[in-house]
Amino acid sequence: GDRIYSIISGYGVNNDGSLKAGFTAPSVDGQSEVIRDALEMAQITPEDIGFVEAHGTGTQLGDEIELKALNDVFGGASNDSRRYLGSLKSNFGHLDTAAGGAGVIKASLALSSGTIPPTASVTDPVESLILGKPPFIVNSSPVPFPTPPGKPRRAGVSSFGIGGTNAHLILEEPPFGGGHKTTRSNFIVPVSAVDKDRLDTLRGQFELQLG
């Protein structure tokens, strides 16, 4: 069957409304609230999260507000629980409307593989991460995904839209490895073309590659 890379155990969506500083400027309260809503739906605590895929646009205003919201939620978590923070935008830039979906894919692959990929181009930690007791680690090389004893690996994914819409997902690794081995030896490969000659050519290419 199809492989399951992660399951969604909780989510939260809201809008900053009058709390935001401007149309394109987010709100600390709105972002922290949406993360807490997702944790509550998943019936877990901040200590259960091993990795957060941040919205992380790389802007001074946006990143500072997001880090304040994350510190607000995770700052009281146990200091002996390792928790990592990253953003796919450091690798690919801002993917516009696909940014949130790309973050889900990254977090799902990290859960499935048990490895958190590095966040690129981070050389100096920002002030918001080094004040007091930081709840996050920004890794510059691949690291093992933290696995709490007797619990599945879990990740949070944030995506914030222009106009103040905030979304946060809680993902966790699927039970039983996310799938099962198939015993099928034959598979149907659909092939189509605009005419028979091109269909025969395409079929021959498939036979060459799969043979």
Descriptions of predicted regions:
Residues G1-A193, D197-R203, L208:
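Condensing-enzyme catalytic core of the thiolase-fold
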